[in-house]
Amino acid sequence: MNKLLEYITNPLFLALIVFLVLLLTFNILQRLGRGRAWKQIAAETGLQFSKHRTATYRDQQLSGIYRERSLALIESVSEEYDADRRRSERGDNRTNTDTDIRLKINVPQGIKMKLNRVITIGEATRVTGNAEIDRHFNITSEPDWLAPKVLTSANVRQKLPRLKMGGNIFVQEAELLFNQLGRISDGKYLRFLLDFLSDLADAVEGCRYG
């Protein structure tokens, strides 16, 4: 009994307990805040808020029509999305929770684009001809002319600097996909993403494909 009392009154043990309680409290508050942010977006945009069961717990989802386009914003784990595509793009099985935003687009078969923010040391690879865009973003597309045309369009170019590190954008198989590891709690950033990705989808669809 004395040894047990010594153990539970040990300063290191008490510090660990306090840390775990604070961590649990932070996670609960963050989850509640994220839920409020998503519900507010649903109220403002008309998107449908729901929860879907995953391997961990019920993750959130927004879906519906946004700016005349089918859109889905989903918190998901590996089995919630096409594993073959994600393995080829990221080299893993997505065992952690990701945030996906998917928009349907009307483009010819074989059209592809990939975009993500990077930290460039040294000279940047010239892709768009815009020094700031080429320096801060990794960009590829098929056909080659697609990315320069889309990323230098007025609406996309204006919003592009606000895109944060960690997000990957893909255009493939008549879908525009934004993917980021982890959950996004910042409601303002989520609203920005919805508008930016919609502008990007409009720009991709607006190109003339031979």
Listing of model-derived features with the role each one plays in the protein:
Residues 1-15:
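Feature marks short, highly hydrophobic, charge-poor N-terminal signal-anchor/signal peptide-like helices
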Residues 20-46:
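Transmembrane-cytosolic junction motif
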Residues 16-22, 106:
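Core hydrophobic alpha-helical membrane-spanning segments
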Residues 38-67, 72-210:
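Charged, low-complexity intrinsically disordered regions
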